[in-house]
Amino acid sequence: MHSTPDYRAMLAVALEEARTGLAEGGLPIGAAIFRVQEDGTVALISRGHNRRIQLGDPSLHGETDAFRNAGRQRSYRDLIMVTTLAPCWYCAGLIRQFGFRTVVIGESVNFSGGEHSLRELGLNVIDLADPECITMMRDYIAANPTVWNEDIGID
């Protein structure tokens, strides 16, 4: 029997990506994809951050950046998507489409997005309610409401 992965350590990778995105002038949303190996160790597959502002690509959310960086995988069912913020509907659709079974969320206080739909589909959704994720996103939204609304598709 394997022990539970250290989700907070996994979130630390996504948080580092979120900080990078913020430093680049973008939204502070990061993601990382991991695989739990047969022996219980956790391997980082990829990482990414929201680069919508930096590259002018409205589809380049944190989860999609990490997904693209993962390249082709034979299966996504045994991978864990870790994100600093609850996935929006677009990213939740990607998670569903490719069959991820576990999603670790840094926070859903500032935005719950498609979290509930993922739970309803039977995915293992782990919300860590991380204080740094909550504060970073709250402060960003307060300082950049127009950019934030654009990111989640609100006019």
Question: Which ranges hold each PLM region?
Answer:
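Zinc-dependent deaminase
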Residues: 1-21, 87, 93-155
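Short loop/turn motifs at secondary-structure junctions and domain boundaries
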Residues: 22-26
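Short beta-strand scaffold segments in enzyme catalytic cores
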Residues: 29-39, 43
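A structural microfeature
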Residues: 45-48
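A short acidic/small-residue loop/turn micro-motif
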Residues: 51-54
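Short HxH-centered metal-ligating active-site micro-motif
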Residues: 58-92, 97
